[in-house]
C-alpha cells in the first residue's frame, strides 16, 4: 500500500508532556471550553492535562512529519493521568489522521478514506446492534470537533477520567468502512442514514444511531474487528472501486 509505519516510544511523549507547563496551555483550554455547548464531569485540571498531552503529541507529529498516528491510549492514562481523546480530536481537525488504542487497521482505513474523499472520519465501536431493524449505534469518546454541529466536554467513559468529547453530529447519509485481514486485503463497506444522536449512560460519549441499508448482522456475525470508520456522505462506489482495483475482498 506504500504506507510506512514507525514505532514511537511513549517515553518520548512523556518527556515532552512533562516539559509543557500549565500556563502554556491555559489560553487554549479557555478558548476550547468557550466553544463547547457544556462542560460536564471534567475539571479545569483535566482539561489542562489533556491539552498538554495534545501539545506533546503535536510536537512529535511535526518533528517526525507524520501523516497519521494511533495511540496506546490506556498506557498513556496510566502514566499521565489523562486521556488522549482531546489530542486525537484536535489532531484530526488539523488534518492529521489520529486513531485510538493502537488500531493500525482502522487508522489505515481513515487515511485511505481521507485521501480518496477529502473527508475526516469517525472511528467508533458498534455498541448496539439491532439485526431486526438494521440499526446500529456507533460510539467513541473522541471525534474531530469540525465534524460536529455542537460538542460537550465530558470525561472518558471507561475510566471516568481525563477528557472525552461528546459530539452532536448532523443527520443524513453516512458510509461505514473498515479495511482488515492480515495483509489489509479484506474490507467491509456499507451505507446508511444517521438518524439520531443518542445519550446512553453505558456507552462512550459520542453516540450515533444509524439505519443501515445492508443487513446489520455483519456486526454480530464476523466483523473485521471492533472499530469501524464512519464518513458523512455516501462514498460506497468510490471506495468500492478503489479497494476492488487493489485486489481486496469485500466482506458482507
Which functions belong to the PLM regions below?
Residues 8, 72, 119-126, 252:
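Flexible, glycine/charged-enriched surface loops at secondary-structure junctions
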Residues 23-44, 114-136, 193-196, 225-248:
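A broadly tuned preference for mixed-charge, low-complexity surface segments
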Amino acid at each position: 500500500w506504500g504506507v510506512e509505519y514507525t514505532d514511537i516510544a511513549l517515553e518520548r511523549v512523556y518527556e515532552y508532556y512533562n516539559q509543557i507547563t500549565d500556563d502554556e496551555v491555559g489560553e487554549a483550554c479557555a478558548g476550547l471550553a468557550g466553544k463547547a455547548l457544556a462542560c460536564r464531569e471534567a475539571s479545569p485540571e483535566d482539561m489542562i492535562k489533556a491539552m498538554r498531552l495534545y501539545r506533546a503529541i503535536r510536537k512529535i507529529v511535526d518533528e517526525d512529519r507524520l501523516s497519521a498516528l494511533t495511540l496506546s491510549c490506556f498506557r498513556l492514562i496510566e502514566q499521565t493521568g489523562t486521556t488522549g481523546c482531546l489530542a486525537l480530536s484536535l489532531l484530526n481537525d488539523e488534518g492529521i489522521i489520529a486513531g485510538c488504542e493502537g488500531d493500525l487497521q482502522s487508522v489505515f482505513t481513515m487515511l485511505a478514506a481521507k485521501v480518496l474523499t477529502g473527508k475526516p472520519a469517525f472511528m467508533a465501536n458498534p455498541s448496539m446492534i439491532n439485526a431486526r431493524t438494521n440499526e446500529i449505534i456507533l460510539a467513541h469518546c473522541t471525534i474531530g470537533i469540525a465534524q460536529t454541529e455542537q460538542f460537550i466536554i465530558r470525561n472518558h467513559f471507561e475510566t471516568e477520567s481525563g477528557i472525552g468529547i461528546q459530539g452532536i453530529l448532523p443527520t443524513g447519509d453516512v458510509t461505514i468502512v473498515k479495511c482488515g485481514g492480515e495483509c489489509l486485503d479484506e474490507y467491509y463497506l456499507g451505507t446508511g442514514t444517521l438518524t439520531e444522536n443518542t445519550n446512553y449512560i453505558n456507552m462512550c460519549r459520542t453516540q450515533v444511531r444509524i439505519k443501515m441499508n445492508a443487513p446489520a448482522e455483519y456486526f454480530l456475525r464476523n466483523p473485521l474487528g471492533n472499530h469501524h470508520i464512519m464518513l458523512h456522505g455516501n462514498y460506497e462506489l468510490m471506495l468500492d472501486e478503489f479497494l476492488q482495483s487493489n485486489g481486496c475482498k469485500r466482506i458482507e
